[in-house]
């Protein structure tokens, strides 16, 4: 499993797609799940990636079309604690303004446990200061610990 210590190219490589495979398996009978994010983009786009605004870098991984409607799905893999970078959180809030429900498919890779979290729930708890916070040692990126 790729971690925050790996660069973008490592994180999106085929060998690190455990979370995406679990997400696709979870939603396969719940509607049409369409790949939307950067993982399947042509390699030419990667060279421009650093110049993009954060809201585009943090686009959701999938769009789900089901009988209940359309939703954005972001898949996040983790071990022990789900850490949501604050910059991703801010970008997801922008995507959330499209009036399309936004969900995080959180996958605990070692335990093979999945949880679906509505972004609105995360926003409410973050605004109330209910999440512990931290920062990665390698790059200083701040995050919320989502429980």
Indicate residue ranges for each PLM-predicted region:
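Active-site-adjacent loop/helix micro-motif of nuclease/hydrolase catalytic cores
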Residues: 79-89
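Conserved catalytic cores of phosphodiester-cleaving nucleases, focusing on short active-site segments
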Residues: 27, 60-79
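Nuclease catalytic cores
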Residues: 1-24, 32
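A structural signal for short, well-ordered beta-strand segments and their strand-loop junctions
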Residues: 35-37, 72, 103-106
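Active-site metal-binding core of divalent-cation-utilizing nuclease and nuclease-like domains
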Residues: 6-13, 35-68
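Nucleic-acid nuclease catalytic cores
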Residues: 93-123
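Short phosphate-binding/catalytic loops that engage adenosine nucleotides
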Residues: 31-32, 100
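Intrinsically disordered, low-complexity terminal regions enriched in charged/polar residues
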Residues: 115-147
């Amino acid at each position: 499993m790729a971690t925050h210590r790996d660069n973008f190219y490592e994180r999106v490589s085929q060998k690190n797609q455990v979370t995406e495979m679990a997400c696709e398996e979870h939603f396969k009978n719940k509607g049409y799940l369409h790949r939307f994010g950067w993982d399947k983009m042509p390699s030419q786009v990667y060279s421009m990636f650093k110049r993009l605004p954060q809201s585009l870098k943090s686009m959701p991984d999938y769009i789900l079309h089901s009988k209940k409607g359309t939703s954005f799905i972001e898949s996040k893999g983790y071990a022990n604690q789900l850490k949501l970078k604050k910059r991703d959180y801010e970008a997801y809030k922008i995507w959330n303004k499209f009036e399309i429900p936004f969900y995080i498919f959180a996958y605990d890779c070692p335990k093979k446990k999945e949880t679906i979290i509505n972004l609105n729930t995360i926003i409410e708890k973050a605004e109330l200061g209910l999440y512990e916070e931290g920062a990665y040692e390698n790059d200083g990126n701040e995050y919320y610990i989502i429980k």
